[in-house]
């Protein structure tokens, strides 16, 4: 393995600025790793070798001319395949979009291009971002590059599993994912990475193939906190093309890992039945580290942990069923092999063959909760409970600055583990409450499971308090990995 691919974004940037290496050298080193490893992990659906070389050469020309450049100029990256990339196939890992080539670029990927970042390829994912294991992709499951003591192929988490596996296996120093209910944070925990979900509205969703418009948010996976912050600085900021985007300037990170006098809340409801004693001990030891760094640890109550999963899946499935109505077999990726005498027959046949099992399951659920018989009992009730969840967090943040809990109730599980749908959904029990409340949160690796697989801890801050969130995560990282 070439040592170049192990460098952080900051070290790559410094080496590029000093002309010790070129962007093209960085790109070739990462492409070699992809060629050697991607057949095993299946982390990337598409590798854009020639486009990457062209962008690397442009970055090298800018550096050679001594132009003012961004931290990401010339740095390789991987993009989750739900972001529209102009002229580059974008599938959302679904048969329904297997031939879709966008004519426009998403806002966040445009910002990366403008900063000079070099896309190496599109990352595999759960189909339409529906999943927690990255086993529902039309292009096949993604394998976690780590195995620990289990000795079998493990999931990388989902739905941004390809983005996580790519960074963990050194295909790029960072990747762009998306997070609706935990799709960046849970893979970060399973693959030993830092995974940030910003406040809803911090980053534009324009050009992102939606799962649930009111919950989706761009997210970042990296191998350390500083790199994550550097990428967040680039992709954040107001976009008039997205009406839900907050009218804020792009984020500027003021690095300060001094967390003395910070109050950290420990939600008692996260001590759920069946949570392993090993994870509980790791949670307690993480809290003790923060205490030793000067933070005050306070027990808090978040009853919403017990019902947020229900609220999330009702709202998410309802919105997803509405979003997926656009895939009709006429636009995007028509299928000439399907013959039908009526439009209704075409819709039925196309969706039967184009959507996977998990997508169909959520479509049925979403259609039911939006029906005349289910709307009041399910969707309207879930929206009312969502307000209660927001109020609970608001009350807690009057007492503490950040909240600490495990990212997931377990480590990575076998790809062929055959979990039932409800068991799979329980993987998100600690991440969906903050998604429903639309708060910023981050997962940071803090240790290993009994099977030597990574485990992450989850930090949540108040709205638009990403700087505090990153600084607490940085303090924890510095203490754990001196």
Swiss-Prot record:
One of its GO terms (biological process) is translation. The keyword ATP-binding applies. It comes from the Bacteria. The keyword Transit peptide does not apply. The active site is at residues 80, 159, 183. It is an enzyme of class 6 (ligase). One of its GO terms (cellular component) is glutamyl-tRNA(Gln) amidotransferase complex. One of its GO terms (molecular function) is glutaminyl-tRNA synthase (glutamine-hydrolyzing) activity. InterPro entries: Amidase, Amidase_CS, Amidase_dom, AS_sf, GatA. It catalyses: L-glutamyl-tRNA(Gln) + L-glutamine + ATP + H2O = L-glutaminyl-tRNA(Gln) + L-glutamate + ADP + phosphate + H(+). Its EC number is 6.3.5.7. Keywords: ATP-binding, Ligase, Nucleotide-binding, Protein biosynthesis. PANTHER family: GLUTAMYL-TRNA(GLN) AMIDOTRANSFERASE SUBUNIT A (PTHR11895:SF151), TRANSAMIDASE (PTHR11895). Allows the formation of correctly charged Gln-tRNA(Gln) through the transamidation of misacylated Glu-tRNA(Gln) in organisms which lack glutaminyl-tRNA synthetase. The reaction takes place in the presence of glutamine and ATP through an activated gamma-phospho-Glu-tRNA(Gln). Heterotrimer of A, B and C subunits. Belongs to the amidase family. GatA subfamily. NCBIfam families: gatA (TIGR00132). This is Glutamyl-tRNA(Gln) amidotransferase subunit A. It comes from Neorickettsia sennetsu (strain ATCC VR-367 / Miyayama). The lineage of its organism: Bacteria, Pseudomonadati, Pseudomonadota, Alphaproteobacteria, Rickettsiales.
